[in-house]
Amino acid sequence: FDLVRDHDLECEAEQSGWIQPAHSPGRFKAISEKRYRQWEKHGADVELLDKADLESRIGTNFFFGGFGNKTGGHVNPLALTRELARAAAENGAVIYERSPAMSYTEEGDGWRVTTPAGNIRSRALVVATNAYTGEAAPALAPRLARSVMPITSWQLATAPLSDNVRSTVVPDRQAISDTHGDLHFFRYDARNRLITG
C-alpha cells in the first residue's frame, strides 16, 4: 500500500486487513497457527482468530479459526495495472505493447531485447508474462519453465449489497482467502458488491 500512496494510484485500494480462514481443524493447526508465529516473530501486525472470533469478523461459522494481518487489504487488479503503467510512464519508462520479446541478452550495462519489429535496449529488464509464462518461458526464461503450474480460476460479483447485509458479512471489509490449495476468496469492491472466486 506504500506504493499506492507514494504514486497516488487510483485502484480502489482498501487497507482494511486480510484474513485467512482455515477450512479444517488440521489446516488451522498447520497453517494459521504456524503463519501467525512466523509473521509475529518478524514484527507483523497479525492476530490468531479462534472459530468464534472469525465468525464475528466474516459472518459465517463454516471455518475453524484463522490468521489475520491487520495491514493487508485489497485492490482492483485491473485498475492497479493501469495505474502502475501510468506511474511508470510518468517516471520515464517506455511501455511497448503488442511487441512480443523473442529473446534477450545481457549487453554492456544493460539488455538487448529482440522483437519481431527490431531490437530494444534498456538498462533494466523485467520478465512479466503472468498467465502466459508457459508459452513464453522456454525461449525467454528457461528456469521459469519448470515453475509453471496451471491454475483455473473464476470470479463472480453480487449486486451492490445493502448496509444491513454488509453489517453481517465481513463488516470491516477485509480481504478473505482461505487455506484450500485451490483457494476461495472474497472481498468487497468500491460499489459494495461482494466479489468471490
Positions of predicted regions on the chain:
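A conserved short coil-to-beta-strand element within the FAD-binding core of flavoproteins
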Residues: 49-60, 94-111
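Conserved active-site and cofactor/substrate-binding residues in soluble primary-metabolism enzymes
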Residues: 49, 75, 79, 96-99, ...
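Extended non-membrane alpha-helical scaffolds
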Residues: 78, 91-94, 105, 128
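Active-site substrate-recognition segment that forms the wall
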Residues: 3-14, 101-103, 109, 113-114, ...
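Rossmann-like flavin
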Residues: 1-87
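General structural feature for long, well-ordered alpha-helical segments within catalytic domains
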Residues: 31-35, 80, 84, 97, ...
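Secondary-structure boundary elements
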Residues: 86-96, 191
